[in-house]
């Protein structure tokens, strides 16, 4: 992608955000965002588009080792600075070291409590607590991880966040490897640079929730699966490591593990014969099915059945919930209406009535809304270029995860969409590096529709509460 085109897309990205924010703030001036949230959002949008535009042209022609070093160390420096900044910012503005009194505080309190019992040698209490006072296997992973850190390093919150910063920085390298092998060097480098400056992947390092670890495990698992098949190096470690990562992923969110297994099956089936011959496909599929059955007859399997039984039968859950608390237009939250916007939703909240966490990341949410066009276009380009087989691992994972999220009661939650963001960056980078002039017409139309959709989304939030 040329430097001129990079700037062109960045200008549109910034312009659409500022226009939408201005129109919404004027139209709903009694409910406009406070100045601090506006500045947060503007800062997030400018940070991503301006720095991506500056650094991608500078780094795109470096030799691979030099590129890796720059990506990792710049990403790590940014994330370490944000961890320290957010620590004091939350303390000053929220009264404690968390962005909101939600899940992060709960995970912290439980893990600190368990670490005290471990130091006393009371392992029986710890096992009993994890078994009886957590929400199933998918709630165990993060709690055990935090408990381990607090046992070694004490009750401070910074150590866990420093590890998040390290994971987030290395994630940029993992994204580069996966994107480069799938779509080529240009795409891999652009995806890595966007990953370095993607605000939400930075902001998650300053939050005490499990999304950063979950994202890291899932993308690393995909990269190792991709390496296993493309390298044809079927060593013990190359086979066991992806299985281990999938197992760990189940400990953070059940659907992540399910989608990883599904994506690998699709990738193997659709791989051309020069990658996996017929005999290799039979062996690989047999091993994958065997691993799946092992998972199925454990606590993981019980949760998979619960996911299927409750989530997919409860696609109208949010509509009923909104109606029960007196909100209007709950009908529109049904999955059949939301599913077509799986890549785009949820849209950025630009009104004061949104939760604090959502206002804090509303600029990041907008960037995802904007890049969703290129992610969707990537599917068209892959088919157009007859590269859909190369795209099968990434596509199967992303589409299956988004489909599950959109057909459950989590379809409106930003947090549940965050694991999809790294692959949206990969897909967007692929589309941007293979744009045709004709594609820009669709891009202009999308920018206009996005402005209208942002206005309608925020109006709907106010109208549902009877405020407009």
Predicted features along the sequence, with ranges:
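Membrane-interface helix-loop-helix junctions at transmembrane boundaries of multi-pass membrane enzymes
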Residues: 176, 181, 231-237, 277-279, ...
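Hydrophobic, aromatic-rich transmembrane alpha-helices
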Residues: 52-54, 341, 345-388
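Transmembrane-helix signature of polytopic, membrane-embedded enzymes
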Residues: 158, 175-197, 392
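Transmembrane alpha-helix segments characteristic
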Residues: 14-20, 76-79, 241-244, 386-406
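Transmembrane-helix motifs of polytopic, lipid-linked glycan transferases
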Residues: 55-57, 162-182, 374-378
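Membrane-interface alpha helices of multi-pass inner-membrane proteins
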Residues: 202-203, 237-260
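Membrane-interfacial entry segments at the cytosolic side of transmembrane helices
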Residues: 63-70, 233-240, 272-289, 436-448
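Short acidic/glycine- and proline-prone juxtamembrane loop motifs at membrane-interface regions
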Residues: 206-214
């Amino acid at each position: 992608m040329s430097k001129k085109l990079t700037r062109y897309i960045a200008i549109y990205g910034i312009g659409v955000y500022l226009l939408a924010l201005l129109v919404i703030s004027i139209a709903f001036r009694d409910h406009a965002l406070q100045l601090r949230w506006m500045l947060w959002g503007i800062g997030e949008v400018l940070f991503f588009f301006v720095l991506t535009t500056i650094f991608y042209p500078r780094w795109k022609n470096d030799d691979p080792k030099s590129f890796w070093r720059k990506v990792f160390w710049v990403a790590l420096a940014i994330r370490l600075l944000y961890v320290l900044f957010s620590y004091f910012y939350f303390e000053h503005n929220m009264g404690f070291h968390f962005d909101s009194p939600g899940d992060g505080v709960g995970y912290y309190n439980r893990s600190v409590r368990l670490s005290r019992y471990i130091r006393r040698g009371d392992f029986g209490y710890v096992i009993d607590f994890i078994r009886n006072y957590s929400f199933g296997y998918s709630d165990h992973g993060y709690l055990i991880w935090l408990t381990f850190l607090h046992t070694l390093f004490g009750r401070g919150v910074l150590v866990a966040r420093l590890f998040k910063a390290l994971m987030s920085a290395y994630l940029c390298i993992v994204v580069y490897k996966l994107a480069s092998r799938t779509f080529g060097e240009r795409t891999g480098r652009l995806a890595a640079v966007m990953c370095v400056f993607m605000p939400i992947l930075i902001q998650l390092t300053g939050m005490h929730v499990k999304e950063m670890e979950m994202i890291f495990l899932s993308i690393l698992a995909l990269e190792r699966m991709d390496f296993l098949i493309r390298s044809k190096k079927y060593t013990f470690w190359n086979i066991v490591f992806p299985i281990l990562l999938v197992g760990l992923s189940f400990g953070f969110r059940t659907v992540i593990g399910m989608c990883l297994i599904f994506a690998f099956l699709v990738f193997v089936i659709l791989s051309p014969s020069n990658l996996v011959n017929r005999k290799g496909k039979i062996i690989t599929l047999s091993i994958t099915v065997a691993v799946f059955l092992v998972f199925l007859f454990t606590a993981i399997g019980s949760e998979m059945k619960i996911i299927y039984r409750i989530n997919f039968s409860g696609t109208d859950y949010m509509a009923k919930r909104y109606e029960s608390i007196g909100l209007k237009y709950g009908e529109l939250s049904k999955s059949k209406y939301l599913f077509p916007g799986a890549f785009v939703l949820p849209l950025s909240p630009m009104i004061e009535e949104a939760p604090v966490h959502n206002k804090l990341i509303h600029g990041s949410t907008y960037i995802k809304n904007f890049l969703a066009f290129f992610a969707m276009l990537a599917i068209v380009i892959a088919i157009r270029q007859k590269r859909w087989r190369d795209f099968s691992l990434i596509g199967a994972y992303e589409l299956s995860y988004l489909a599950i999220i959109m057909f459950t009661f989590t379809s409106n939650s930003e947090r549940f969409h965050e694991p999809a963001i790294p692959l949206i960056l990969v897909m967007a980078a692929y589309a941007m590096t293979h744009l045709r002039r004709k594609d820009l017409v669709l891009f202009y139309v999308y920018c206009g529709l996005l402005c209208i959709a942002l206005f309608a989304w925020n109006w709907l939030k106010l109208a549902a509460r009877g405020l407009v």
